[in-house]
């Protein structure tokens, strides 16, 4: 594995970023971040990033944004209703009960949508390195649960990547920030407010060790929620002025969402901005326009509750870390929303110090992931770093009366393993069903069900006699594994958690094949476009040259060129790249006669004696002017 290329990817709700070692890689459009947007067009194309974003207004129902908010979630989760209300695309219930997306007449898992973004980032890395890239470290919000982490890992597999590690976004940011700052031990807080999620992590840095002390967060709080508050305000303002509700107009809503996001960004550096959307809708009286003066003060009043929601997780993380506010040496801001002055002010007030501003909040997570990827891939220049992360949520089982019994507490350093001995509740019981949950609530049903398994084939015995040791294991990715052993017989059994949701191996394989097939289609489509562009360019230049130099070649040569142009034009309408290339080559070959004529013309022109600049026409008289120097008296 040593020396292999491994990339770091920040798969974000709003934007994503890819890096190698400590360098951020630009995408095909030349941008350092890629919008996490995927669109399905009527002609069967899949657009990713900025091209998808640009057509969102006219194709809102088939343009998928913020799919990270759906990843690893059940359709019946409370947050799904809110997401369905906020976005124009359709969310459906998959056969396994997960939330999926319907677009372009097909259904997609959120992992598939994420995979499309990952493929674009992977291709950018391959273009940059000139080599095939198959390994990556992908980041997730620290507060992602097991299902969300597994679904993110699945997205990587669908994209053709071996996911070396899933790491927490704040931890990755700390890695990038603190790489050259581990000579002395210091405590840092990473405040990560991104497009869709919020995390805060408390870490101790020193002697090459990055140890996460505690983490907390909210997987449904981010820039998308800020945008929604602005959008709702604009809808109400328009309704007051015009008596029309824009909430049922998908086209208008998409324009409003884009305007809201733009205004939010502008107000990070200015006090006031104009939101001007002409022809936003129309009624019998004619077109309607939206024009609103929007101030920073108004924005801050609209989103103050959202900003306040970040403080409670900060308090919990500090408490769990065992540190006081004054013991935090540095506060690092991550995520685009931390550019908002009101957010910076709130963080400063809580921690009692100005946040560190030496990192790019949009790129630092990808850089940290790339540093970790380089270490795991055995890069020759990899630094000797130990990364100790934690599990964000407690892991346990349902016991008598529906109580949640914790086996691994939140903020336990991972990887970790815990064992618990169980027995039977009835005489001669041959099987035990164990339900595994993740969360912090007292009752099991209030937490996230990861899955359940049945341990079968227990020898007949009075109740309470069999000794079944069940081991819960959380790996370095934060993903849960379970095994069981019958202590009485010494026989070990492999137990697989039958998760109630998530993708099966068969589904993942099918999606991997679809992604590979789609990549071939995309390659063929690109080759066709390039072939047509080359053909049209050659036709234009040949016709131009023919009009200028056609008289310099024989009529038979001219006819051959005309025929070749006609042949090429006739195949342009066909979607056959090889045929277009064949006819392009034929035109290129016969038009060489034109090139020869042009060359001869330029040669003869350069051999003609050019007129002398100092020659005078016959009869022209050159008169030398007479002048007298006049001296300035004042200069004496």
Curated annotation (Swiss-Prot):
PROSITE patterns: HSP70_1 (PS00297), HSP70_2 (PS00329), HSP70_3 (PS01036). Residues 514-530, 614-624 have a biased composition (Basic and acidic residues). Keywords: ATP-binding, Chaperone, Nucleotide-binding, Phosphoprotein, Stress response. Induction: By stress conditions e.g. heat shock. Residues 514-542, 598-636 are annotated as: Disordered. Pfam families: HSP70. The keyword Cell membrane does not apply. Disulfide bonds: none annotated. The modification Phosphothreonine is found at residue 197. Belongs to the heat shock protein 70 family. This is Chaperone protein DnaK. Residues 625-636 have a biased composition (Acidic residues). Acts as a chaperone. One of its GO terms (molecular function) is unfolded protein binding. Residues 601-613 have a biased composition (Polar residues).
């Amino acid at each position: 594995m040593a020396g292999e290329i491994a990339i770091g990817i920040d798969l974000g709700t709003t934007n994503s970023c890819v890096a190698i070692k400590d360098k951020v890689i630009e995408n095909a459009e030349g941008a350092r971040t890629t919008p996490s947007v995927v669109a399905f067009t009527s002609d069967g194309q899949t657009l990713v990033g900025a091209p998808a974003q640009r057509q969102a207004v006219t194709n809102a129902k088939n343009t998928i944004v913020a799919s990270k908010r759906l990843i690893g979630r059940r359709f019946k989760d409370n947050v799904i209703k809110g997401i369905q209300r906020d976005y124009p695309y359709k969310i459906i219930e998959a056969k396994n009960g997960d939330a999926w997306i319907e677009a372009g007449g097909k259904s997609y898992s959120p992992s598939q949508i994420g995979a499309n973004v990952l493929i674009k980032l992977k291709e950018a890395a391959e273009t940059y390195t000139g080599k095939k890239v198959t390994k990556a470290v992908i980041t997730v919000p620290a507060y992602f649960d097991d299902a969300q982490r597994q679904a993110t890992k699945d997205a990587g597999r669908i994209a053709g990547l071996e996911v070396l590690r899933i790491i927490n976004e704040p931890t990755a940011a700390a890695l990038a920030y603190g790489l050259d700052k581990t000579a002395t031990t210091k405590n840092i807080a990473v405040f990560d407010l991104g497009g869709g999620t919020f995390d805060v992590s408390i870490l101790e840095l020193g002697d090459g060790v990055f140890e996460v002390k505690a983490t907390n967060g909210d997987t449904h709080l981010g820039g998308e929620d800020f945008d929604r508050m602005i959008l709702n305000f604009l809808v109400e303002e328009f309704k007051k002025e015009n008596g029309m509700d824009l909430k049922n107009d998908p086209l208008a809503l998409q324009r409003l969402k884009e305007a809201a996001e733009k205004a939010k960004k502008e107000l990070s550096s200015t006090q006031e901005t104009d939101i001007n959307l002409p022809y936003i809708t129309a009624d019998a009286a004619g077109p309607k326009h939206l024009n609103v003066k929007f101030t920073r003060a108004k924005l801050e009043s609209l989103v103050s509750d959202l900003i306040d929601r970040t403080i409670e997780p900060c308090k919990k993380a500090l408490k769990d870390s065992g540190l006081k506010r004054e013991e935090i040496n540095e506060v690092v801001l991550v995520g685009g929303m931390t550019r908002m002055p009101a957010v910076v002010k709130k963080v400063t007030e809580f921690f009692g110090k100005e946040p560190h501003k030496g990192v790019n909040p949009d790129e630092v997570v990808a850089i940290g992931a790339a540093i970790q990827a380089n270490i795991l891939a055995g890069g020759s220049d990899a630094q000797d770093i130990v990364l100790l992360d934690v599990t964000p949520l407690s892991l346990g089982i349902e016991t008598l009366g529906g109580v949640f019994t914790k086996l691994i507490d939140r903020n336990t350093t991972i990887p970790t393993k815990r064992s618990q001995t169980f027995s039977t509740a009835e005489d001669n019981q041959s099987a035990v069903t164990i339900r595994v949950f993740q969360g912090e609530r007292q009752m099991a049903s209030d937490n996230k069900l990861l899955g359940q398994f049945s341990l079968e084939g227990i020898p007949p015995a009075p109740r309470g006699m069999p000794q079944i040791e069940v081991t819960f294991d959380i790996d370095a990715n934060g993903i849960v594994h379970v095994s069981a052993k019958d202590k009485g017989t010494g026989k070990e059994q492999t137990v697989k958690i039958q998760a109630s949701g998530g993708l099966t191996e068969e589904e993942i394989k099918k999606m991997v094949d679809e992604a590979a097939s789609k990549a071939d289609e995309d390659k063929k489509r690109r080759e066709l476009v390039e072939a047509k562009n080359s053909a049209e360019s050659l036709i234009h230049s040949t016709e131009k040259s023919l009009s200028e130099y056609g008289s310099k070649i024989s009529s038979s040569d001219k006819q051959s060129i005309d025929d070749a142009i006609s042949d090429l034009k006739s195949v342009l309408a066909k979607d056959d790249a090889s045929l277009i290339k064949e006819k392009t080559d034929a035109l290129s070959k016969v038009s060489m006669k034109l090139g020869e004529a042009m060359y001869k013309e330029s040669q003869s022109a350069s051999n003609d004696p050019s007129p002398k600049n100092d020659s005078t026409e016959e009869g022209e008289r050159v008169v030398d002017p007479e002048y007298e120097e006049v001296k300035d008296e004042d200069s004496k």
